Amino acid sequence: YSLQNDPEITLIDSTIEWDEGYDVTARFLDYLNSLDAGFVAELENKTVEQLWSEYKASYGPNGQ
């Protein structure tokens, strides 16, 4: 998913939760980061590189 997939979608249904799909989560995290650049990394007190490494590792050595 890319935030640029559908630039026309700016509003979300008020019943949707932040973790209901990649698009919703991506837009929410982008919003948080727009409030304070680096917010997502600061939230975890880790660099983006560390977060990315942990994310990849969560899928195992072959991305499974």
Curated annotation (Swiss-Prot):
It holds the Pfam family BSP. Transmembrane segments: none annotated. Inhibited by EDTA. One of its GO terms (molecular function) is metal ion binding. Glycosylated. The keyword Hydrolase applies. Its EC number is 3.4.24.-. The keyword Protease applies. One of its GO terms (biological process) is proteolysis. It is an enzyme of class 3 (hydrolase). Keywords: Glycoprotein, Hydrolase, Metal-binding, Metalloprotease, Protease. Its cofactor is a divalent metal cation. Metalloprotease, digests gelatin and azocasein (in vitro). This is Basic secretory protease. It comes from Boswellia serrata.
